[in-house]
A protein has these predicted regions:
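Feature captures the catalytic ectodomains and active-site-proximal regions of enzymes
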Residues: 1-350
Length: 350
């Protein structure tokens, strides 16, 4: 569906470069900082196609779908943070210390496991600090890990990994654009600098891409600059009937006390007004937000109520979240086109 017939004919080596936070609708602004991005946007090199991120449009969910080839309802990594049904604890998927057990939490075979079983040498190129995390164990099983942080290092290690074995699959990750967007905002000088630096990784890979290789560049989500926030910690009435708040600022999960759904939905609906939609878990599933199938385990992890923020609004001030979160300028997780549309750029050498 994404690749035309024969597009991979003769290709023995594939590199996938994931640029965190690099939404499709950001390409126009990004082109100001990178002639490579501008050429990609204009169709001068490779093939650019808009595709859709996951719901929620947040990093661990989309990375899991990419790494497993499954929608969130199947792989079960279905929120930035979710409540563990058995214990009631919160798991933050990007800071996962190994509990709950990653192989049990996400039991589906990864793309790397399937490829490795067919003789493909698989490598992940990313920050070494992520190597032994729960998320890595859950979604990158089957791949070797090569540490690299700076864009030029990622490019060099990607090329080196492509040359391993007769057939190779390399997945590389760069967080720079997302980080700059969170702390400084889309379009800020810092964001444009991050785009310029990351584009050097694209240039480096293109320069040395083997003749029998293809490069795919994509993202996990886009981003919006916030203009309005609801601070839950300033509204104690919103905590009545709520046991736990999870998710992220643009897509909140509310785990309610038994029988409190209607009361909580009414209170939150009055607080967010037209800035967000408050719906029940079953309605969110019925709309297909998490894919055509949601497993029983996945269903349990979704909040009893789901609060999907519109426009440039977010819900912050949630107990247990880092104190800098309410100050973040760029955020994502919601359903807007700016968050959901991501690029898929393909380039074949030779």
């Amino acid at each position: 569906m994404l690749l035309r017939g024969g597009e991979l004919s003769g290709v023995r080596r594939v590199a996938v470069l994931l640029l965190d936070g690099f939404g499709y609708h950001l390409l126009h602004q990004a082109g100001q900082a990178s002639s490579t991005v501008e050429a990609i946007r204009n169709g001068d090199i490779g093939t650019l196609t808009p595709i859709t991120a996951t719901v929620p449009s947040s990093t661990p969910i989309s990375l899991a779908s990419l790494a497993c080839g499954l929608p969130p309802g199947r792989h079960g990594i279905i929120g930035f943070t979710v409540r563990v049904p058995d214990s009631g604890d919160l798991v933050t998927h990007i800071r996962w210390d190994g509990e709950p057990d990653p192989e049990t939490w996400q039991p589906e075979p990864t793309c790397f496991e399937r490829a490795a079983a067919d003789g493909v040498v698989c490598t992940v190129v990313s920050d070494g600090a992520f190597r032994d995390t729960g998320l890595t164990r859950a979604i990158y099983r089957g791949a070797d890990w090569t540490p690299a942080i700076a864009p030029y290092e990622v490019a060099e290690e990607t090329i080196a990994a492509l040359h391993r074995g007769r057939r190779s699959l390399v997945y590389s990750y760069l967080p720079d654009i997302d980080t700059a967007g969170h702390f400084h905002g889309i379009g800020s000088p810092e964001w444009l600098e991050a785009v310029a630096e990351v584009s050097e990784a694209i240039d480096g890979i293109l320069t040395d891409l083997p003749k029998d290789a293809s490069l795919f560049v994509t993202a996990d989500h886009g981003m919006v600059n916030l203009t309005e926030r609801l601070h839950v910690d300033r509204h104690p009435d919103l905590l009545e009937g709520v046991e736990t708040i999870a998710g992220d600022g643009r897509m909140r999960y509310l785990y309610t006390r038994a029988g409190a759904d209607a009361e909580v939905a009414a209170a939150w609906g009055a607080a967010v007004r037209d800035r967000a939609e408050v719906i029940g878990r079953d309605e969110a599933i019925g709309r297909g937000w998490f894919g055509p199938v949601v497993t029983a385990a996945g269903r349990e992890r979704i909040g009893d109520l789901v609060v999907a923020c519109r426009d440039t609004f977010a819900i912050v001030g949630v107990e247990g979240e880092p104190p800098h979160v309410p100050r973040l300028i760029g955020q994502h997780g919601g359903l807007t086109a700016a968050e959901m549309a991501v690029p898929l750029w393909t380039y074949r050498n030779g």
